[in-house]
């Protein structure tokens, strides 16, 4: 089993697919994704659908773009002029995808490593880090 860690996919399905092919990604491998799965690239919908299907292999933490998407879906934010979320927001399964995405963590710990999107807030204690990471 191999573990691959990537960050900031940002809706770039074609590039993610090509990279996984180049890595010869297998069913027994793990894909660690350090947030920002959506927005900026053209295929946020494909990225989320594929990663949801890979739920047993993918270890995901949320990034600011993912949180922005969730805030749009569940209220509180509007899509901005630079957002590339129109296809995703108009998808018939957008709510299912959003509910799946919001179950992902802000940090993940495994194999002796801790993964976050952009560091750890100073107000979090080590106990909280450990507690949240163990919340698998």
Predicted region positions:
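Active-site neighborhood of divalent metal-dependent phosphoester bond hydrolases
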Residues: 45-131
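N-terminal active-site segment of His-dependent metallophosphoesterases
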Residues: 1-54, 67
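A short, hydrophobic C-terminal helix/tail in secreted or cell-surface proteins
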Residues: 132-136
């Amino acid at each position: 089993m191999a573990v691959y860690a990537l960050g900031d996919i940002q809706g770039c399905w074609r590039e993610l697919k090509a990279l996984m092919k180049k890595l010869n990604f297998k069913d027994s491998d793990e894909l660690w994704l350090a947030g920002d799965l959506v927005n900026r690239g053209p295929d946020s919908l494909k990225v989320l659908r594929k990663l949801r299907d890979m739920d047993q292999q993918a270890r995901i933490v949320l990034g600011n773009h993912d949180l922005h998407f969730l805030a749009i879906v569940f209220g509180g934010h509007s899509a901005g002029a630079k957002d590339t979320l129109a296809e995703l927001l108009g998808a018939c399964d957008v709510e299912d995808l959003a509910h799946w995405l919001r179950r992902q963590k802000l940090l993940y710990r495994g194999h002796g490593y801790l993964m976050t999107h952009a560091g750890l807030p100073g107000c979090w204690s080590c106990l909280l880090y450990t507690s949240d990471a163990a919340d698998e």
